Swiss-Prot record:
UniProt keyword Hydrolase present: yes
Reactions it catalyzes: adenine + H2O + H(+) = hypoxanthine + NH4(+)
Family label: Belongs to the metallo-dependent hydrolases superfamily. Adenine deaminase family.
Matches recorded under PANTHER family: ADENINE DEAMINASE, N-ACETYLGLUCOSAMINE-6-PHOSPHATE DEACETYLASE
Protein name: Adenine deaminase
Gene Ontology process terms (BP): adenine catabolic process
Keyword Iron belongs to the record: no
Entry's Gene Ontology molecular function annotations: adenine deaminase activity
Species the sequence originates in: Shewanella halifaxensis (strain HAW-EB4)
Amino acid sequence: MSNLMDKHTQKIDPQSLQHMLSVLRLEQLGDLKLTNVSLLDLINGEVIPGPILIDKGHIIAVGQEVDLLAAVRVVDCHGQIAVPGFIDAHMHVESSTMTPFEFERTTLPLGTTSIVCDPHELVNVMGRQGIDWFLRCSETMHQNMFVQISSCVPAVAGLDINGSDFSLDEMAAYREHKHVLGLAEVMDYPAVINGEQAMQDKLTTFNNLNLDGHSPLLSGLSLSAYVACGIQNCHETTNVEEGKEKLAKGMAVIMREGSVAKNLDALAPLITDFSSPYCLLCTDDRNPHEIANEGHINFMVKRLIQQHDIPAYLAYRVASWSAAKHFGLRRLGLIAPGYRADINLVSTLDAVDIQRVLIAGEFVDELTLESELEAKLEASSPPLHNTVKHRPITEAELTIPLKEGEYRVIGVVKDELLTNHLVCHFDGQHFAEPGVNKLAVIERYGHQLPPALSLVKGFDIEQGAIATSVGHDSHNIVVIGADEKSMAHAVNHLLEIGGGFCVVQQGEVTADLMLPLGGIMSLERSEKIAEQISDLKTAVKAIGVSLSEPFVQMSFLSLPVIPSLKMTVKGLFDVDQFKFVSLRVDS
């Protein structure tokens, strides 16, 4: 049975360790000495003077004792401060629309040296092929990519149609892999709480590894039952009261700042000296446009310090050591002997202005991330094949036969994945409340099912339509529009290009982004993706949409494990009651 001590970054090979010891005995030269540098001690909360000596990818000495030691290379850091490399404690690379190698090229220079990812987006599309590809990528990446094994594919059995199931036998086969830390977010919390045998078998199989959680708004006895089954963390916490209960019950709270779900400001007050070992940071779902304009984990650290007056040592602690400690990664998260030399150099702690980054003792700006990307991607054999399959859609299929009465409407909440369960009156011509648009979810795995139809409020589309093949977690096509003709045009365009995002206005596609890899990922550079996302944002504003991230927000309308009202290919789903409901209230 695998254990965490066998995982990536956990061990120093015997030959390297012997060399490190010989350097400390003054018998050989180390690889790199950082001089004119201080370092942040996250345990005592102090900045202490360097230098720092690195050998075989690891820190072997810090402080005045380093003056006794010599190295092959000496680098003057010009008074900068060394802090541990940042760890994104929960994320989906696919949600960035980038390949893992492009994600590495984009975020490693920003100081994110490790990521704990759940590839369940791609696994929902193509099963174990998706996990296999991520693990192949992890073997040749400089960034530490840990791959959690997707626990709920589909998110909840029977509620949606996806591209592939992922059985327990298939899941168990990955336990021994050195880049696998455990089970990814357990979204089917009713199955956990109700003690369903299939779920208990999954938890038991991975019991000696990490068990990641997903429990939005869960509290009281339900939360106690969830935690009692061994679930260790949650990234779906949205308010302080919820966070305090989870912390008190032994869960780590992973604070999220994604492209839509922005919970950092609400949860920042949770961070104290006492709680900080159990407070982690994550992006979950963050696209290249946000990364380019704001940053990644570095943005979160800066916000904690500058907007919330969190002491710098606590902000850096929750961005690194807390996550390393939580996941049992004993050689990550500190600037101390025996730890991997994953280091960010900043001019001041409060500015979080990263000057240089080291990964395993190598300066990132001296690596060949750009030139090696294409060869690495090709060698990884990405699973490129046609996954967006459906006959062309007609206007008639998207028409909802509305009659006077009360209708359930999905109420979108700005910058939240949670939705409201609205009831709106239709007088035979119009809805009493403005801004109600048509919504359709269309199965795209070749079953040729008719569209599932519903209503949504919050996008405020005045004309045209927007569509995406990124629809968590099953990734069927989601389309929202003011009229059926525009909606059909948008869907059919996605079918033609093999998946992606698009905007239709006055019968024309005004912006799009192709996602050929599983219908959810691009093969382009992050800069081009960010530019195309910017074009999409401009195009959606032109048809009346005011949401800051409409495509990300609409992609979660089909995820039936986040309250309150969602829409899958099987119909309208009330998450609070955990049952399908009719569109018309009196039906």
